[in-house]
Amino acid sequence: MSHVDDGFRSLTLKRFPQTDDVNPLLAWEAADEYLLQQLDETEIRGPVLILNDTFGALSCALAEHSPYSIGDSYLSELGTRENLRHNGIAESSVTFLNSTADYPQAPGVVLIKVPKTLALLEQQLRALRKVVTAQTRIIAGAKARDIHTSTLELFEKVLGPTTTTLAWKKARLINCTFSHPQLADAPQTLSWKLEDTGWTIHNHANVFSRTGLDIGARFFMQHLPENLDGEIVDLGCGNGVIGLSLLAKNPQANVVFVDESPMAVDSSRLNVETNLPEAFERCEFMINNALSGVEPFRFNAVFCNPPFHQKHALTDNIAWEMFHHARRCLKINGELYIVANRHLDYFHKLKKIFGNCATIATNNKFVILKAVKQGHRR
């Protein structure tokens, strides 16, 4: 938990999920403060759009202006809602929209936290292009090291004239004025053929490894089990290639695709529809914080390629939460399979949670682990 006085109001903010007290990560950064410093409240005429507000620092500070919080992270929405409540601000003050939704017309102010991927930034800038005017104040912010020439060129190409500020507390801002430059249309998804399958994999802008199969998933797919039945989960599904493979290998199983990214879940749904339409009725698609709210003892198996970062921050909190949720939701003798970089040492974490862990396969970079939910552990 951390305190910030941004000039609009004094706030107490926390990350979601919370980090441990030994290695705490802040729920806000200098770029949030810098954005708010540059914003004169007298300029706010018309809707306020906030993009990629990781834990609600901007939304909480500007709550009295009824902002729209736009992004592709259910975790960020949950974190923002929790911080609104914690600071005594009505959740209804903020309207939450997915990045692929229609944005409000003629906004007075647009604040953008520059996302990690240029593809997501381009998708969002193209969406803004349809609604902003020459009078819209457009300001983006990030750590100075995360603003590159390619970032500025993208703003110029999609929206118009772009300038940057001096660095402050290692943060930098981008100011942009909409001038309606000529711009060719772009497809909503990026597609590629998955070798040895005949499948075409479709990827929305914010999907991990959207330009091709990542090497961890490739290794995982080589060792997925067969002859499973009942309900199984592709947890943190991304574009759904693991779940697709499980559907093909296990015709008696139903697969639940889960991710905190709406774009990932939409990509998974599209990939089942286009590649295995006959298996679509065996699928469920869920935008969720891991398996929050899912009943215990439901699944026969969970498959997971856990992230070790949240936006720009390195953290194993999300993976840790995924493992605990998986154990709670597995049936007795249900199995959790994960693939991970070897250096993360998830073997001992799983053994601590499940009381057991076995190595299924390993190579010079990745390891595939299996843990079984045993009846004698609660």
From Swiss-Prot:
Q: What class of enzyme is it?
A: transferase
Localization per record:
Cytoplasm
Q: Which UniProt keywords apply?
A: Cytoplasm, Methyltransferase, rRNA processing, S-adenosyl-L-methionine, Transferase
Q: Which reaction does it catalyse?
A: guanosine(1835) in 23S rRNA + S-adenosyl-L-methionine = N(2)-methylguanosine(1835) in 23S rRNA + S-adenosyl-L-homocysteine + H(+)
Taken from the UniProt entry, a GO cellular component term is: cytoplasm
Record EC number: 2.1.1.174
Principal location:
cytoplasm
UniProt GO MF annotations: 23S rRNA (guanine(1835)-N(2))-methyltransferase activity; nucleic acid binding
- Describe the task this protein carries out: Specifically methylates the guanine in position 1835 (m2G1835) of 23S rRNA.
Q: Spell out the PANTHER family in the cross-references.
A: RIBOSOMAL RNA LARGE SUBUNIT METHYLTRANSFERASE G (PTHR47816:SF5), RIBOSOMAL RNA SMALL SUBUNIT METHYLTRANSFERASE C (PTHR47816)
Q: Which family does it belong to?
A: Belongs to the methyltransferase superfamily. RlmG family.
Q: Can you say what this protein is called? A: Ribosomal RNA large subunit methyltransferase G
Q: What is the lineage of its organism?
A: Bacteria, Pseudomonadati, Pseudomonadota, Gammaproteobacteria, Enterobacterales
